[in-house]
Amino acid sequence: MNLVDLWLSRSLSMCLLLQSFVLMILCFHSASMCPKGCLCSSSGGLNVTCSNANLKEIPRDLPPETVLLYLDSNQITSIPNEIFKDLHQLRVLNLSKNGIEFIDEHAFKGVAETLQTLDLSDNRIQSVHKNAFNNLKARARIANNPWHCDCTLQQVLRSMASNHETAHNVICKTSVLDEHAGRPFLNAANDADLCNLPKKTTDYAMLVTMFGWFTMVISYVVYYVRQNQEDARRHLEYLKSLPSRQKKADEPDDISTVV
């Protein structure tokens, strides 16, 4: 073996050793940055699995290079503003089977345009801010939530790229129209535009009118009672004055009798 072959062989060995060392450092770095209670692996990108970890909130120390994030089957109740803003490589986000009730307006800021799959099914979401899913390109699963079907929900679903697929399994737990409760959202939206419902101004006008009539009636009754009381007082005074007049009228007769 000549010197060139020997040098190439040693160079190749050094490169392989250096590569292995770099990979070990990366793995150690990823493991050291893994949130408490979660498992991290680097198969096809950094996968962070925090399923069934009894988490009550979304960890704030998630590695920036996270690609797949599983937070399902925990006790998370809300998604705060910009909680994922540093996860620019995030593609899959699973938040199913939690107790999520609140999603802040800017909850998905920073990942809305890169996220491919978002699972929010089996939570307690009734409504969200109309801008919460703005620019979201992900295939979203939001079924099995106690949705309140109204104009805001209609606007939210229209703003999502996968509107029809996302809305397909949404059931109205409650609705601005009572007859839509328990029905699929798409059926409710086909029956009526939830953002263009007639306002119930007639009821208020009726109440104002009834209150006006009621006030007039009460005023008339009060006036009538007071007027009757005044008439009764005058009549009573008149009656009291009658005996004295009769007595004065009888006095001349008594005098003539004595004479």
From Swiss-Prot:
Q: Name all LRRCT domain ranges.
A: 145-197
Q: How does it sit in the membrane?
A: Single-pass membrane protein
Record's keyword annotation contains Transmembrane helix: yes
Print the keywords alphabetically.
Glycoprotein, Leucine-rich repeat, Membrane, Repeat, Signal, Transmembrane, Transmembrane helix
- State the GO CC annotations: membrane
InterPro entries, A to Z: Leu-rich_rpt (IPR001611), Leu-rich_rpt_typical-subtyp (IPR003591), LRR_dom_sf (IPR032675), LRRNT (IPR000372)
Localization (cell): Membrane
User: Is the keyword Signal in the record?
Assistant: yes
Show which residues constitute the signal peptide: 1-33
- Glycosylation sites per record: N47, N94
Organism's domain of life? Answer: Eukaryota
> Mind telling me which residue stretches traverse the membrane in this protein?
205-225
**Which Pfam families does this one have?**
LRR_1 (PF00560), LRR_8 (PF13855), LRRNT (PF01462)
Repeat (LRR) positions are 65-86, 89-110, 114-135
Q: Which residues form the LRRNT domain?
A: 34-64
Query: So what family is this one in?
Result: Belongs to the LRRC3 family.
The name of this protein is Leucine-rich repeat-containing protein 3B
Question: What is the originating organism of this protein?
Answer: Mus musculus
